[in-house]
């Protein structure tokens, strides 16, 4: 490899490593958020109590959600980069859903930060305000579909990774089970939620490691036929 080729490959390596790290970090941050979350459910009384008694945890959860949402962009970017032919359409859909889901988590983080201003006001008024905010039709029509997109996004990302030979069937099948479980298990079961997020971290962390260990030739936009990624066996 000459000096020019080596210099040109450096930005591509940075992009690869950023994508790999983001695939691991975005679900790991959600594990932290779920373990600390003092405001599960988001009702007026819950938000007021959390902002009064555990404002630090509320800030930590907000930051975790917002950074997790931001990291969805480089995370799906790594998958999109590898979807050249096989699985390209599914990966494109996964990218769109994943980024929209990231917006949803960013919105929840902002909601948590806004709740920090609740203490100090008249309690019933503050509780009623959050209730009205939750019941706002425009909010429901915009934010809740974005939150739904996150679950659909991680599901599509896992199947897209399988289609592009980055992971074995255990990954998308497990993620599918997690998403379905999240829909059928009642809210307010933190241990189950944390366990599900840990599994997502394992799956997407594996994908991150897999992408991080690709050679420059495998990561190149147009690899030679003999440099195409070998299918995942695990």
Residue ranges of model-derived segments:
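Hydrophobic, aromatic-enriched alpha-helical segments typical of multi-pass transmembrane helices
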Residues: 2-234
């Amino acid at each position: 490899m000459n000096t020019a080729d080596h210099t040109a490959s450096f930005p591509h390596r940075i992009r690869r490593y950023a994508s790999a790290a983001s695939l691991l970090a975005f679900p790991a941050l959600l594990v932290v958020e779920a373990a600390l979350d003092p405001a599960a459910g988001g009702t007026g009384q819950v938000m007021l109590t959390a902002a009064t008694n555990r404002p630090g945890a509320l800030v930590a959860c907000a930051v975790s959600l917002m950074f997790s949402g931001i990291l969805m962009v480089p995370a799906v970017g790594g998958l999109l980069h590898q979807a050249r032919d096989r699985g390209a359409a599914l990966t494109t859909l996964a990218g769109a859903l994943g980024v929209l889901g990231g917006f949803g988590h960013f919105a929840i983080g902002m909601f948590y930060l806004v709740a920090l201003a609740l203490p100090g006001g008249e309690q019933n008024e503050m509780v009623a305000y959050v209730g009205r905010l939750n019941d706002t039709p425009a909010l429901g029509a915009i934010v809740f579909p974005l939150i739904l997109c996150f679950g659909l996004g991680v599901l599509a990302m896992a199947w897209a990774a399988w289609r592009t030979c980055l992971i074995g069937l255990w990954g998308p099948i497990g993620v599918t089970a997690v998403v379905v479980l999240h829909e059928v298990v009642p809210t307010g079961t933190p241990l189950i939620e944390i366990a599900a997020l840990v599994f997502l971290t394992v799956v997407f962390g594996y994908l991150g490691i897999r992408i991080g260990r690709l050679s420059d030739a495998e990561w190149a936009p147009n690899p030679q036929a003999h440099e195409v990624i070998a299918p995942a066996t695990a």
